[in-house]
Amino acid sequence: MTKLMELSALGARETMLAQAMNSHNLANASTPGFRKDLATYAGTRSTDGLKNGVDLSPGTVQTTGNKLDVAIDDSSAQGEGYLVIETPDGGEAYSRRGDLRVDLDGFLVNGAGQFVMGEGGRIAVQRYNEIEIAADGTISIQRLGALPNAMQRVDRLMLVRLDEEQTMVKGEDGLLRIEDGSEAIPD
């Protein structure tokens, strides 16, 4: 009887965790760049139970009209790419969240206020009349008082891709990291 009760309790726990995961996915369905969690179960002999996975399939691209919003083109030969985001501890994490803006301190951040990294580190944008991000990720500005066609390169978005053997995990902050702690390959 005790074994039956243990199995029932374990089944109820796994169902509760799966429902919580589904609720979280539903609540964030319209968040730009959100990657849904996947409930995966170990084999029948495993005692590990429910595992978290992450859906890395591309989301839908939405046209916003915002000049700073970007979407990563998956049709390239290198496969999926990710923006590099600076974590609060100065580390590196990855995201496909492309709703970008310039914060009050002049840095390029995503919609969650996380620093988007360029090839030269954090992307600092001086005061400008015009700003654009080219298809290759190059960020250019027309400085205040400059001639209308005088665009100046600021930096280029740092994009990375995964090695076939690397596995992504999603942190509580919604950012993706490589499971073994290695870094992604620059794109």
Predicted regions and their residues:
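Amphipathic alpha-helical polymerization modules
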Residues: M1-D187
